[in-house]
Amino acid sequence: AIMKVLPHRPPFLLVDKILELSDTHIVGMKSITMNEPYFAGHFPGQPVMPGVLQIEAMAQAGGVLVLNTVPDPENYLTFFMKIENAKFKNPVVPGDTLIFKMELLSPIRRGICHMQAVAYSRGRVTTEAEMMAQIVRKDQVKV
C-alpha cells in the first residue's frame, strides 16, 4: 500500500509499514537489518544507520501523511522544503525497529505540510526534527 502512495522504491524506500494514520499524524516503522546496503560502508565492523537516512525515513512517512489528503496521490510528488532543529540522540543499529511519528504543527495549506518528527528505537529517542514538505502535481514539475 505504501508503494501506491510513494514513488520511492527499494533500496531507497525506508518505510516498511504504516502503524497509524490520521488527518494530523502518522506513525511508521522500518525494521533495520544487516542487509541494508549502507551498512557495507557505514561502518565496517560497527554498523550504524546514517542519521540522514533516519530523517529520510521520517520524511517519507510524512509524505504519506500529506499525500493522504488528495484523492489521487499517484499524480503527485513530495518535495522536502526545510529541516530545522535536527538532533541525533542515539544510534540505530541492525536488529532495531525504528518507529517514527510525525505530527502536523499547522494545518496543511496549498499542499504544504509542517511537521514535528520523532524517531524511536529500543524505547529511546534516536532522532528528532522539524520538517516541511510540499506536494506538487507531477504534470506541474519542471525537471
Stretch-by-stretch model annotation:
Residues V92-V143:
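HotDog/MaoC-like acyl-thioester-processing domains
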